[in-house]
Amino acid sequence: MKTELKGWLADNTVTTDNKEDKILVLESAGNLTLSDVLDEMKKEDTGLRAETLKHAVDLFQRTVSELVLNGYSVNTGLFRAVPQFRGVIDGGVWNPERNSIYVSFNQDKDLREAIARTNVKILGAKGDPVYFIGGEDAATRATDG
């Protein structure tokens, strides 16, 4: 599958002294769920039934989750998942109200290679946001501002 990301040029708010300095803001293609991903997988001629694909993906996710939460750094080729602790440990005791577990995900070799092959399309300048400071009800002429 050919990959392409689209984006809008916007002012870089970090460098306010340089009006020509721009960043690219992603034009989202939408949000997908696991079910959507499985539907895309079914389009491939794998010879596998939909239930088999779902079972394999569920097994993969459960296994990676269990391995990470048992202290392993898991490298899948697509990503690397590493567990970390957050918060200060008072008196050498773990306190779930003040401490938490966080798992960081970093892109790995397969994803980096796919990124290198991805086309980027600039859609133009991002328009200024619209601000409404008041309104009037057409029927009652009531205003909110």
Indicate residue ranges for each PLM-predicted region.
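Strongly charged
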Residues: 1-55, 59-145
